[in-house]
A protein has these predicted regions:
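Electropositive, gly/pro-rich neighborhoods at or near active sites that engage anionic ligands
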Residues: 2-144
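Short, hydrophobic/aromatic alpha-helical segments in well-folded domains
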Residues: 136-140, 150, 163-166, 223, ...
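Residues at the starts of beta-strands that form the adenosine-phosphate
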Residues: 145-146, 173-177, 251
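Structural motif
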Residues: 146-148, 232-233
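Gly/Ser/Thr-rich loops at beta-strand to alpha-helix junctions
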Residues: 152-161, 183-185, 239-243
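Histidine-anchored nucleotide/phosphate-binding helix
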Residues: 153-172, 177
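Short connector loops at secondary-structure junctions
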Residues: 176-193
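C-terminal functional extensions of proteins
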Residues: 180-181, 194-279
């Protein structure tokens, strides 16, 4: 996905709100002003984080928040599973509910609160446009042998697990692989988190090999590239995966909540509107 001048301005403003360290902010501005045309936000954030550790100190430790939301959604798991299985189309419902978990994003949102998160479960219906994408998704899954899930946040991955349960029920021949982050970055899910919530019971877990929020194909280890290249279906969660992976030459389905102005304006929807797209 093309990185725009408005994204650059937003990223710089967010750094200014975080610190008044003049040397750090000058370096950030230099990176943004001289960025390559094809760079992704995920790559820029990696550079920012390296500078943060050099000029300011370690990045915020969100391990407590990660565990808090993993535990919160795990405590809701049985009730959510019952709601999914009682619905007219459990797979469709599970996709919408898994997307609701995309709200748990301490990088994109200034604040995350449990009431807003829980309120997102009130609407589990797909729009007419989303149903067209869903029909395409099901048609392709019925013919596929391999399925790759690109995950995003902690807490959200519990809902991803419930989605994968329904996927395996509908399409039992699918071989499932789940890709998580290669190291702690914000509240994104890692291998440890995936095992903690039980995602490893539904598929093979691999990592993107980096401390990177997103999926930048050219920066992935060979194993991750091979899995992407050989997966019949790629299902990517969250804004960061869309920003870094869409338009890079691989067909994929994406679902996310629109949390920043770029997505709100691109899709012309209110904040926190869910999207299900195929590209």
């Amino acid at each position: 996905m093309k990185f725009s001048d408005s994204c650059a301005a937003c990223m710089y403003d967010r750094q200014c709100a975080k610190t008044d360290n003049a040397d750090y902010l000058k370096k950030i501005k230099d990176i943004l002003d001289n960025r390559p045309a094809d760079i992704t936000s995920s790559e820029l954030v990696m550079q920012f984080n390296e500078l943060h550790e050099k000029y300011i100190g370690p990045l915020d430790d969100l391990s407590a928040e990660k565990k808090e939301y993993n535990d919160l959604v795990l405590s809701m798991e049985d009730d959510i599973r019952k709601d999914i299985e009682a619905s007219v189309d459990p797979l469709a419902t599970s996709i919408i509910m898994a997307r609701s978990g995309n709200y748990i994003d301490f990088a994109a949102l200034d604040s995350v609160d449990k009431e807003t998160f829980i309120g997102l479960f009130d609407n589990t219906k797909m729009s007419e446009t989303e149903m067209e994408v869903y029909d395409s998704f099901c048609r392709q899954c019925s013919k596929a042998k391999s399925f790759l899930l690109l995950t995003d946040n902690c807490g959200e991955i519990v809902l991803d697990k419930l989605m994968l349960e329904q996927l395996k029920k509908r399409f039992p021949n699918l071989e499932i692989t789940v890709m998580v982050r290669g190291a702690d970055i914000y509240n994104d899910a890692t291998l440890e988190d995936a095992k903690y919530v039980g995602l490893d019971t539904l598929g093979t877990i691999i990592t993107n090999g980096r401390r990177m929020a997103g999926t930048v194909y050219k920066m992935l280890p060979d194993k991750a590239k091979s899995v992407i290249d050989n997966s019949d279906i790629i299902f990517a969660k969250g804004q960061a995966n869309y920003e870094s992976f869409a338009g890079e030459g691989h067909h994929a389905f994406y679902t996310f909540l629109c949390k920043c102005d770029l997505f709100i304006n691109r899709f012309n929807v209110p904040k926190l509107t869910g999207m299900f797209v195929e590209e």
